[in-house]
Amino acid sequence: MEENIVSENNMKHRSSVYDSMVKSPNRAMLRATGMTDDSFEKPIVGVISTWAENTPCNIHLHGFGQIAKEGVKDAGAWPVQFGTITVADGIAMGTPGMRFSLTSRDIIADSIEAAMGGHNVDAFVAIGGCDKNMPGSMIAIANMDIPAIFAYGGTIAPGNLNGKDIDLVSVFEGIGKWNHGDMTAEEVKNLECNACPGPGGCGGMYTANTMATAIEVMGMSLPGSSSHPAESAEKKADIEEAGRAVVKMLEMGLKPSDILTREAFEDAITVTMALGGSTNATLHLLAIAHAANVDLTLEDFNDFQERVPHLADLKPSGQYVFQDLYNVGGVPAVMKYLLKNGFLHGDRITCTGKTVAENLEAFDDLTPGQKVIMPLENPKRADGPLIILKGNLAPEGAVAKVSGVKVRNITGPAKVFDSEEDAIEAVLSDEIVDGDVVVVRFVGPKGGPGMPEMLSLSSMIVGKGQGDKVALLTDGRFSGGTYGLVVGHIAPEAQVGGPIAYLRTGDMVTVDQDTKEITMHVPDEELAKRKAETELPPLYSRGVLGKYAHIVSSASRGAVTDFWNMDKSGKA
């Protein structure tokens, strides 16, 4: 029988593996990191961040990790800091590097699970700043199911040019305006030099802020934390408090599976609809739900789309940035408003150990007279802005974001491209005319590989004044900064022989947000003929993208990498 030479601590559920006499060699290495007899008696709490110097979203996160460690120490546990990767979407956008963006979500999840599991931590805090950091962290948190909290690095402050707030999307759209002759190269350079004034995630209701909000709503980050700006005193305080709070979770025996219930995901979808969040929320919430063993489907999003109005006048389709929401009460004030009106489940438990309703009691209502959140009686849109479409072009579904779009349906000729680069060249060469349906395919999860975003392309179309006149369809994704008549996540994707693979330039296509249909007007006989004539390209086969292409699921299932439906050959 092994002799424990470290005193018993009922919070050391996992790190107690180091306590016995035969683990003396393990402790010898840990002593070299600063651990002592005293610290061996404490639970070990990991603090893992996606710090990197290459992007404002993450450049400040190493320091935030140090702050979180202080909170862990203050609560009586032993903190250990780790790092994992990030891919900056705004920097990778429109380049071959964009194929690594969604791929990085699952690498982040796997690396967190490997590091936390490999070192037997009792609990952990995950700190993220850019788009895929949030769902990557949450997939790991759900899979590990040990006490954990996510802490968001915070939103960037808006840039300012000539007295007007601007952000990164202003620069992307500036390229379209420059190409159209509405802006000079010098004016675009002025946008470039003033759009990003410091650290923080992209400033509108884009993917980073959408997912940070969703995680707070679900109860896996501290109340109010998602809307605290990156450079605010409140942000530093909530990062430190996250360290203390995760130790409290450990004391209470509170696990992610207690928090990540079906009702938690319903509330996340509700607030995403009300705030006009990113299309990527569908993909990421499906993936997190899969990790949490919660039954969630694309069809569920339409259920909430039909009954939750769009209230927030936030970018990309509105005029305000996320910091403006913070200034009028932040996410808790929005949640209080929705809870009072029967849209949320107030009795759910959260990472504080309190219910949603109990947490919200500590926060003020929306600032009287504010303009960021519109009243339920006069919403920005009567229903939600994220719509799941189905039809013979997308039998498994597709995701449309229709906030700010005046046109409710369009039927037009397809202009089909097998890469974003070719589509961009066509836009810049004025080959795309009003009424066209631009289609970019073979860029899905397997085909990209990595399901790249099309912000460069969509922003150019908007910048040229065609945002309401040209539809853009893809089996890839759109940035949270995208708006206009756009449909992404078309499934099945072209790479696996989805109908989009057989669409040809000139075919008529209908997108209808009222009937939630997406249709290619091609007779079945002609479609069968095209299938017989078409040879699909081989899957990418090298390196991490090759691995990803071979194991990733359909976008309709969240593009997850641990969903297998094995046949007799053992092939996925």
From Swiss-Prot:
This is Dihydroxy-acid dehydratase. The keyword Iron applies. It comes from Streptococcus thermophilus (strain ATCC BAA-250 / LMG 18311). GO terms for biological process: isoleucine biosynthetic process; L-valine biosynthetic process. Its cofactor is [2Fe-2S] cluster; Mg(2+). Binds 1 [2Fe-2S] cluster per subunit. This cluster acts as a Lewis acid cofactor. [2Fe-2S] cluster binds at C57, C130, C202. It catalyses: (2R)-2,3-dihydroxy-3-methylbutanoate = 3-methyl-2-oxobutanoate + H2O; (2R,3R)-2,3-dihydroxy-3-methylpentanoate = (S)-3-methyl-2-oxopentanoate + H2O. The modification N6-carboxylysine is found at K132. Signal peptide: none annotated. Pathway: Amino-acid biosynthesis; L-isoleucine biosynthesis; L-isoleucine from 2-oxobutanoate: step 3/4; Amino-acid biosynthesis; L-valine biosynthesis; L-valine from pyruvate: step 3/4. Functions in the biosynthesis of branched-chain amino acids. Catalyzes the dehydration of (2R,3R)-2,3-dihydroxy-3-methylpentanoate (2,3-dihydroxy-3-methylvalerate) into 2-oxo-3-methylpentanoate (2-oxo-3-methylvalerate) and of (2R)-2,3-dihydroxy-3-methylbutanoate (2,3-dihydroxyisovalerate) into 2-oxo-3-methylbutanoate (2-oxoisovalerate), the penultimate precursor to L-isoleucine and L-valine, respectively.
